[in-house]
From Swiss-Prot:
This is G/T mismatch-specific thymine DNA glycosylase. GO terms for molecular function: ATP binding; chloride ion binding; damaged DNA binding; DNA binding; DNA N-glycosylase activity; DNA-binding transcription factor binding; double-stranded DNA binding; G/T mismatch-specific thymine-DNA glycosylase activity. It catalyses: Hydrolyzes mismatched double-stranded DNA and polynucleotides, releasing free thymine. One of its GO terms (cellular component) is nucleus. Keywords: Activator, Chromatin regulator, DNA damage, DNA repair, Hydrolase, Isopeptide bond, Nucleus, Transcription, Transcription regulation, Ubl conjugation. It is an enzyme of class 3 (hydrolase). Residues 37-97 are annotated as: Disordered. Changing F315A: Restores the DNA-binding ability of the sumoylated form. Sumoylation on Lys-330 by either SUMO1 or SUMO2 induces dissociation of the product DNA. DNA glycosylase that plays a key role in active DNA demethylation: specifically recognizes and binds 5-formylcytosine (5fC) and 5-carboxylcytosine (5caC) in the context of CpG sites and mediates their excision through base-excision repair (BER) to install an unmethylated cytosine. Cannot remove 5-hydroxymethylcytosine (5hmC). According to an alternative model, involved in DNA demethylation by mediating DNA glycolase activity toward 5-hydroxymethyluracil (5hmU) produced by deamination of 5hmC. The lineage of its organism: Eukaryota, Metazoa, Chordata, Craniata, Vertebrata. Its EC number is 3.2.2.29. Residues 66-97 have a biased composition (Basic and acidic residues).
Amino acid sequence: MEAENAGSYSLQQAQAFYTFPFQQLMAEAPNMAVVNEQQMPEEVPAPAPAQEPVQEAPKGRKRKPRTTEPKQPVEPKKPVESKKSGKSAKSKEKQEKITDTFKVKRKVDRFNGVSEAELLTKTLPDILTFNLDIVIIGINPGLMAAYKGHHYPGPGNHFWKCLFMSGLSEVQLNHMDDHTLPGKYGIGFTNMVERTTPGSKDLSSKEFREGGRILVQKLQKYQPRIAVFNGKCIYEIFSKEVFGVKVKNLEFGLQPHKIPDTETLCYVMPSSSARCAQFPRAQDKVHYYIKLKDLRDQLKGIERNMDVQEVQYTFDLQLAQEDAKKMAVKEEKYDPGYEAAYGGAYGENPCSSEPCGFSSNGLIESVELRGESAFSGIPNGQWMTQSFTDQIPSFSNHCGTQEQEEESHA
């Protein structure tokens, strides 16, 4: 009983403590839970998103999709300063200085301090007299000719070499001897244009026309036997200005036209300049100098040497170069054991006074006297075929044989 009273007392205290009627709360609590459970809707599963069809990647080279957005300008990267940048800048400066100095061509003083402008004001005097056989005609003086004051002074010019090789001069001459040629060999010099230029391309057509007219007057005055044009270019210009004929397929040698109002023949030969590409060497041009000499002798009535036969001359630059390589023979080195192996067959002949002694120092004679073979006399026990001199009959068997024969005849 006491326990029940105690429990009821505690319940009454609890009800008195809460302002809200406790019994009403306890009675409505389960109903509220049910209402809450009924108001909560059941969770509906979310629909699955529709899957897009997977597109197969195209075969071949992959390309980036084009973007319609404008590209932003890329700012230039600023060079990163480092310790090496200072060194590279210095090296570039040094390299520029070196290359600048090497680019400047070294000027060669060809005229011993004389300027080119001063040489252009100079002219080269003609070397002409009456009764000349040949007059050599050039285009115009060059710088070296104007500086030297002589004709064809260039070290590479082939004129003076060809003059000697063809027989037109008896000795080898040079540009310093040009003034002696009229008296000794009947050869004179002149030019089509008097003005000095570095090259013939610096001349105008008006100068060529005027020069051709003056040249005809000179040739009509002195009337040499042959007017020799040193190069095709000179005669082509001369023929066009004087004869009014433009020559096609011009060939070297004697030409059909003569100088107007004279008996002077026109002869064309290759340019004596070393820059002549068709005939780069002096020996390639000598043929036309030889033909010039024959023409001069024919006009002067000099009989031709019948011992010399004329052959047809043809020249091919490529074949000439190939033949030059084939003809080049290297010298054999001296072999000290060569003569010993042949028993001194090619050594000095003891009969120095004899014009020809084919005996091999008495080797064959001694072998024949002893009845031995020639092969047993080979030194050092080396076997070698018999020398070709052994098969030639000896004209003098020994140095004293001729003296003995003379004594016996006496």
